[in-house]
């Protein structure tokens, strides 16, 4: 009788221990996966460039970030519109800055509304991976607020003194979307000379030291009106030295 009691006690204890172990095992929570670090892009820009003299329009992209090996851009509809992947040494070392220009078709050949529809307004997502396996990302708001081209002129005051002037810009070009235009800067380019000035400035005197280096004859220049959205419009001009 004693041995039967002892056996029963041992069996009950073993059962209790087994139950305890089973419950302990079931109650142990799963360890959550470690989140992948996210690195922000230093620069993520997408913008229109319209040449009012040539009547062509295209989309430019500029981005900058540390040591990425893969990157893609999605439009507001979540469609991938651009993708780049490094190979060989670029897969191992990564890339940083990237600037590219899309083709700029003439609006005489590609209707404006068709081109605008290819690149809808809204938020464009930039996302990729660094060489360390981290996520790198950024976003940019893309607008159809495209400024008109300024009226430009150039005056050669003396052989080495050149003044370039232009008109204010407060509206889009005729036929473009009726968006609010807020020009924040103008940029002047004369061959290798380049300067950017606030929107309140409407003329630039090109340094005579630079003008002196130009050969006699006709030379081209550009004035860009740059909107707060980042979109910009070029007007071309020329002068004779």
Describe each model-derived feature in a short phrase.
Residues 61, 160-180:
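Conserved aromatic anchor
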Residues 136, 226-241:
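Extracellular fibronectin type III
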């Amino acid at each position: 009788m004693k041995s039967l009691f002892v056996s029963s006690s041992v069996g009950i204890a073993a059962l209790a221990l087994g139950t305890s172990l089973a419950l302990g095992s079931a109650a142990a929570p799963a360890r959550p996966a470690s989140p992948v670090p996210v690195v922000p892009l230093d620069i993520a820009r997408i913008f229109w460039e319209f040449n009012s003299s040539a009547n062509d329009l295209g989309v430019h992209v500029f981005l900058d970030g540390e040591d990425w090996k893969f990157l893609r851009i999605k439009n507001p509809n979540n469609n991938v519109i651009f993708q780049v992947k490094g190979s060989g040494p670029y897969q191992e070392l990564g890339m940083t800055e990237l600037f590219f220009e899309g083709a700029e078709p003439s609006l005489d050949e590609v209707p404006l509304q068709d081109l605008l529809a290819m690149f809808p307004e809204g938020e464009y997502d930039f996302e990729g991976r660094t060489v360390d396996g981290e996520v790198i990302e950024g976003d940019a708001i893309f607008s159809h607020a495209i400024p008109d081209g300024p009226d430009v002129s150039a005056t050669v005051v003396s052989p080495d003194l050149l003044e370039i002037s232009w008109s204010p810009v407060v509206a889009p070009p005729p036929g473009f979307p009726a968006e609010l235009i807020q020009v924040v800067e103008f940029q002047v380019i004369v061959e290798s000379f380049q300067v950017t000035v606030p929107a309140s400035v409407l003329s630039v005197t090109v340094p005579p030291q630079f003008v002196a280096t130009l050969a006699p004859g006709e030379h081209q220049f550009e004035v860009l009106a740059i909107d707060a959205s980042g979109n910009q419009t070029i007007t071309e001009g020329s002068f004779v030295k």
